[in-house]
Amino acid sequence: MADITAVSAVYFDKVKTRLRMRSTSLDDEIESHIVACREDMLRLGINAETAADENNMIVLAAIRAYTLWQFSSEMEIAERSRRDYRDMVDDLRKHAGYGDAG
């Protein structure tokens, strides 16, 4: 089973860049949201290998949307990011090989 808690520095930077944060003060929180997102993907039916795949651009986009949803102070952006995240995970789940049933 893939380790969904392992986040490479390069992957972390890709997510953090989307949040437009330069400070390192929230790095631990950002990383915890990446892991929480992966755990949520498992709960929603995505297999662990897919959730932990740092080369899958759809998964990266979903994780970026999730973290933006969690960090945004603007309700409109947060809600749009939440919908984007849920839509991407739902699409992944429906395709063979990505979901637990796939």
Spans of model-derived segments:
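Conserved short "hinge" loops at termini or chain/domain junctions
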Residues: 1-59, 90-102
